[in-house]
Amino acid sequence: MTKQSADSNAKSGVTAEICHWASNLATDDIPSDVLERAKYLILDGIACAWVGARVPWSEKYVQATMSFEPPGACRVIGYGQKLGPVAAAMTNSAFIQATELDDYHSEAPLHSASIVLPAVFAASEVLAEQGKTISGIDVILAAIVGFESGPRIGKAIYGSDLLNNGWHCGAVYGAPAGALATGKLLGLTPDSMEDALGIACTQACGLMSAQYGGMVKRVQHGFAARNGLLGGLLAYGGYEAMKGVLERSYGGFLKMFTKGNGREPPYKEEEVVAGLGSFWHTFTIRIKLYACCGLVHGPVEAIEKLQRRYPELLNRANLSNIRHVYVQLSTASNSHCGWIPEERPISSIAGQMSVAYILAVQLVDQQCLLAQFSEFDDNLERPEVWDLARKVTPSHSEEFDQDGNCLSAGRVRIEFNDGSSVTETVEKPLGVKEPMPNERILHKYRTLAGSVTDESRVKEIEDLVLSLDRLTDITPLLELLNCPVKSPLV
């Protein structure tokens, strides 16, 4: 028997272990505060889906998809229409990611809700078509499996390393998270869960060059949701894949996505299962307050602090006195966002990914929300924003690479024409040092959801999600999510 054959029969690897954990996870295994937190993460994902459903690039995605996809049984959030499960999952994921307001992980960058919720919702509707009822606790358990597995698999390949090398990391290690969440919802055995994982992992991909223009970055986490859902549904139907996909020495997920990274060891297999059942990544999923890449939230918060400290100095009327803005970033942030836009007009997605443009709009508007990146009325062509963006110089600081939770850190120094300067450092932005309070997430939900639908529906969804653990059938929730919404930009 060859070594590879022996490996294929082994049941002791980390793939088997995390699949066994996911398949057998029960409510009693999970602390009550984790169960409660999961509901608020679901609520945040729903808010982002609603507010993202009718922005121009989402409408274009729906228009293109509807032109070739037949109707199906799975609801499209905010449109009153249905598609097949794979198409619905991709579409709903594109909505959650559409505005850069959705959650992120500060050590292993990915956007969990945009992967987990679309896959789990679609899988639940597949089961409903078969006459099966899915409860709220079924959804919570599946979501927690996704919330817990994505960051662990990401950390096994050094979190942001993929991002530094040009991969859209969340689209890569989000695929197995989507498969595990889907598999949990479908009730897969540990063996079938491994099949789902293998099918998802062999499709994993995502190029970060998508950040420089176009619309496709908005749906790349949708590829992960699709891959995970497809893996789960095929495994549910008895389709088989390789076992031990994560740790295989030839063609395995961890091996292939760490080639050439210069690390020793190149990957940390043990991270896949580290702290399962005792440490909960559900609490390390970060909530965004700014509509831009999470890796630059530290610099944005630093500018905010300076604006509060020096209101006259940084008043909009006095911004012409700024000679230069220096910003120091972590390796991940500098690789991803430390670039100066050269082409005008900039696209919305490029604006949300460029630290120079992001800090410029924060200085001009004293906020960094969806409106700052709207493509309407020449908003992205404002001369005062461009003048400031070209005064920003990003650089790397090794100081921010020492702690995985400092990937979003930033030090900003603003230099004025008279030679004076002001400086502020934020190592861990709000929600990183300590989890964002649930009450703050609820406020964000109400604000975003209230901008696109009526108050009564906002309240209905809120009540259903926050009592999800007591909901015997999630159909009423999915029906409400399907109701048409309006654009937040008009």
Curated annotation (Swiss-Prot):
GO molecular function: aconitate decarboxylase activity; protein homodimerization activity
Domain of life of the organism encoding this protein: Eukaryota
Transmembrane stretches, start-end: none
Stated pH dependence: Optimum pH is 6.0.
Family indicated by similarity: Belongs to the PrpD family.
Subunit relationships: Homodimer.
Protein name: Cis-aconitate decarboxylase
